[in-house]
Amino acid sequence: MAAPEQPLAISRGCTSSSSLSPPRGDRTLLVRHLPAELTAEEKEDLLKYFGAQSVRVLSDKGRLKHTAFATFPNEKAAIKALTRLHQLKLLGHTLVVEFAKEQDRVHSPCPTSGSEKKKRSDDPVEDDKEKKELGYLTVENGIAPNHGLTFPLNSCLKYMYPPPSSTILANIVNALASVPKFYVQVLHLMNKMNLPTPFGPITARPPMYEDYMPLHAPLPPTSPQPPEEPPLPDEDEELSSEESEYESTDDEDRQRMNKLMELANLQPKRPKTIKQRHVRKKRKIKDMLNTPLCPSHSSLHPVLLPSDVFDQPQPVGNKRIEFHISTDMPAAFKKDLEKEQNCEEKNHDLPATEVDASNIGFGKIFPKPNLDITEEIKEDSDEMPSECISRRELEKGRISREEMETLSVFRSYEPGEPNCRIYVKNLAKHVQEKDLKYIFGRYVDFSSETQRIMFDIRLMKEGRMKGQAFIGLPNEKAAAKALKEANGYVLFGKPMVVQFARSARPKQDPKEGKRKC
């Protein structure tokens, strides 16, 4: 049975194991990196100050420059001086002190003083003690000193432990929990090896050799303790089973050794490299031309045609004039005639131009009554239905001319050419058609069916024309009145800008103009 492997002494700092654990009886120190500013005598005095009996300072050139050998009376004094001198900063230099090796001591023998020789000759007891200590060391470090094997272990021999597995690690953890001294020694070893402390959160599980092992049949369970009196085998069975047992044990040992060697040489798999995403190439122009265009956001809503917004140009030329009179028109004309008759009865005092019935095409034409402006305002306010805004509210809600000049919306304001359609812009987001009907409905006679049909509101809520509206009124007079009164009215915090809508008129050919001239 082999003896357990001896623990290695782990050094701290820059010192080697040989410097901290010298052989017994070693009293000579090798001091390196001595300052060049010091002379040989000063270096000798420095080392003697720390307890050295004899000092040999080497030259300032060569492999061992700025070094010195210091011999101390005993091993304890040498160790004490080493702990004090090692890593000591002196004149900008850091001293490195270690025990002198045997070859260094052979090549550079230290001179011994006469007093030292006398002590050695007078004290033969110390030599006997050292010899006894060396003999004790050989016995202590031998293979089996109880059996007479006092020679040391072969340094080439090494234990071949199986690779770590979950069961082995679980057994080690159980041993740590049951043996407190073992637990403390493991913590000491982790501290010396500069491993992370195990007192924090659980670390990630490293790859185990079990993951790379081929699956094999589990080994048969072994009994923890052999029976006291096992049954004796028969004589006939002994002869036949001896050979098979030897063969099976040899084969099992070989298989186990082969598996252990394979696992020892097996390298863990490398982690799979994550493939980088392919960078998209820039598309060429010819490919972009053939690809179908993505549907724009505006396609989700009905597209307004130019004919829905602007008046269409009329082609120049002779046209046949046709009248398409619907069935509802006679009833509308009857109502208009009844109103005219009522107006005739009221204004019978005013002079009228009488025309012969044979020359009258569509009835009688009467002059406009001359009424004051104040009377018109009263009539308008009285005749307006309750659904529409009053003139006073319009005047209160309008901004002054001075304020219009300061606003950027009214800087380049032009009313445009008069027509029956008006264009309103700078509307707020919350404006709806009913709000515009509430304002511009006061310029429409809702009792007249023709004016009701001609009154049209188109509010643009989306797209490029958002915040604008086109309003069709019965005639140019109503449109001019609406422009004058509603321009600058603040609706939902924003003043409205009212203009006459631009009508697309046909362009004359230059040839026709020249012919006319």
Swiss-Prot record:
- Keywords noted in UniProt: Disease variant, Dwarfism, mRNA processing, mRNA splicing, Nucleus, Phosphoprotein, Repeat, RNA-binding, Spliceosome
Q: Where is this region: Necessary for binding to m(7)G-capped U12 snRNA?
A: 211-380
Q: Where in the cell is it found?
A: Nucleus
Renumbered to this chain, region (Disordered) spans 1-26, 106-130, 213-254
| PTM sites of type Phosphoserine | S21, S108
- Give me the Gene Ontology terms describing cellular component: nucleoplasm; nucleus; U12-type spliceosomal complex
Record SUPFAM superfamilies: RNA-binding domain, RBD
* GO BP terms in the entry: mRNA splicing, via spliceosome; RNA splicing
- Necessary for interaction with PDCD7: annotated segments: 1-257
Q: Which disease is it linked to?
A: Pituitary hormone deficiency, combined or isolated, 7: An autosomal recessive deficiency of growth hormone characterized by severe postnatal growth failure, delayed bone age without bone dysplasia, and hypoplasia of the anterior pituitary.
Q: What is this protein called?
A: RNA-binding region-containing protein 3
